[in-house]
C-alpha cells in the first residue's frame, strides 16, 4: 500500500488524469467511426495458418478409385519442392503486358516456341539453387457421397481418418453427368475454407511432376509481382494455365452430349480437363456465382465459358500439359500426363516416363498432334502450328 501511495503522488496524478481522459476519448471516437457503416466494410476471412496454402490440388476421383488415390499418394505427392532454381524465373517465365485497352497481349506462337526451347535446354543445365521456405501444398480428393451405400460411405470415412485428404461432397451424386456440379461444389468448399494462391484441377488418372509445377508457379507469382511493381498495372492479372483447345465441335450425342450450349457452333477456348491451373481470384469468382452459372456437361468447357468475358486473364497455353482424352507422343518435357494407370504413375515416379505407350492397342488411331496456340487467329484456326 505504501508503494501504491508513492506512485499516486499528487503531482503524478495531475499528469496521468489528462492522459487517461485523452486515451478514453480516443477509444470512444474510434468505435464511433468504425461503426458508422459496418455493412459496407467486409471483414473477410480471418487468417488461419493451418488452412493457408500456396497451391491447392483438387483431384477429381470416384469413390471406388482407391487404387488410383493410393498410387498418387505414393508417387507425385512426395515431389514437394525443397529448393527453387534462380534461373527458372529469368529464362522460363513470361509475364504478358496489357495493351492500351486493358487487354492482355497473350503469347505469340514464336514466344511459346522459344519458351519451350528454353525449358528443354534448362532441363540439361546444372541448376543454381536457393532455399525455398514456407511452401505449402494441400491435396484434396473430391468425392460425391450423395446416394452412396453404407459400405462405400464407411470406406471413404475410414480413408479420411487415415489420410485426411478427402473432400467429402455430401450434396453431390458422383457420376460423369454431375461432373460440372462436382467441380462447382468443390470450388465453393475450398474457397470458403482455405486461403491459397493457385488451384490445380486434376483427374485421378493424371500424373503431375509436382516439384516442377510448384516451382513454375512460385516463379510466376514472384515475377508477376515484380513486373506489377515496376509498371503501372491496369489491374490484377489472373492465371488460367493449361493446354487450350479452340475449335472443338459441340457434341450432339453420347456421354458428352451438350444440349444447352447455344453461344456458337463451336466451343470457345478452354483448357483441357485432364489438368489445369486457376488463380485464386478465378476460383472465388466461380464459387461466388455458382448458382447463376450454366451447367454445361463437360466441366473443362464450362470453366472456359464462364471465364471467357474477362480481359485480365492470362490464358497460358503450355504444351507441357499432356491433358487430352488420349496421350500425345511421350516427351521428357511433359509436366502433366493424363490417362495414366496406377502402374504407369509408379513407372514415371521411378524414372520411366513412356511405359504407357507399350500398352496402347494397335490400330487404335494415331496420337494427337501437339500444337502451339495462335491467339491472333479465330478459335477455328487457332491450333494448326504443330510443335
Regions found by a protein language model. Name each.
Residues 1-387:
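Secretory-pathway lumenal glyco-enzymes, predominantly type II signal-anchor Golgi glycosyltransferases
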